[in-house]
Amino acid sequence: HENFLGSYYERFSEIAQQNPHAWNQKVFTAEEIKTPSEKNQRIAYPYNKLHNSSWNVNQASALILCSEELADKLNVPTSKRVYPLVSSETNHMIAVAQRPHLTRPAGLYLATDFLLESAGSHQIKPSIFELYSCFPVAVQLFAEALNLPDATDKTITGGMPFAGGPLNNYMLHATAQMLESIRNKPSEIGLITGVSGLMTKQALAIWGKEPLMDFQSKDVTSEASRIDIPVAMSANNDGEGTVLGCTTLFEHNEAVKSIFYVEDSQGERKVLTSTDKDIFKNLGEQEWV
């Protein structure tokens, strides 16, 4: 998995090098990305600094969203106009430990299905993508929901670690650059994704050079809340359980604490922690989930 993530983000780095707006245009190899170092410190296994968003950046972006009537009055050239075609979102929030499926949020799939089905009914197929990249799992979950092959580029900017991820404003940056890309190549159909918090909320949008369909949008929160019902937390202090997810937190490249999400025999959840050095070592060498 570390090798996979290294190669995945090496490609992001290569794309950032070609982005004149990118914060960091240096190309990092897969080996540099996956290997902890003084400048690429491990944050939480298996993620290092270069896997995560660079939010301490000085960047700004803007776009003008208006009606065609106003655009005509302002004499905005048709060559500069790009149209939102369809969007979807979910705001159903559940604590990570209580999610029925840690890596398969119902809201994400409902929102994705609506987006692709709405576009598909008008023979609209996305050709370029900007998947939110605060950390690799965000990219991977969206790619899986969208059924994108590994070989398909997941970013046009270079992603948040390299292009820059200005805190909660990256979606505006991604959209502005997507519109630039579509202006430069009008045949492209762009798809952008976003998240909030710990993969808590998800949103998607498709843009095109021409108004190929009447704009559609849907909030699937209510539907998602009926499917993803929070799992109860366990009050048991001992017993057996199944590990659903785990990581080890690091400070200055030294392991400090392992964290486990566990489901007990009653189907309830528990969050466990350990500072045992043998567990630190074992968790990095064997699959616990």
Where are these regions (language model features)?
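Conserved "HGTGT" condensation-loop signature of ketosynthase/thiolase-family condensing enzymes
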Residues: 1-57, 61-63, 68-70, 76-162, ...
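Active-site glycine-rich loop that binds ribose-phosphate moieties when present
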Residues: 174
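A conserved active-site cap/scaffold subdomain adjacent to cofactor or substrate pockets
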Residues: 167-171
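C-terminal substrate-binding/catalytic lobe of Rossmann-fold NAD(P)-dependent dehydrogenases
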Residues: 197-198
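Active-site core segments that coordinate phosphate-bearing ligands/cofactors
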Residues: 187
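Oxidoreductase and adenylate-handling cofactor-binding alpha/beta cores
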Residues: 177-183
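Cysteine-clustered segments with highest specificity for TGF-beta superfamily mature ligands
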Residues: 190-192
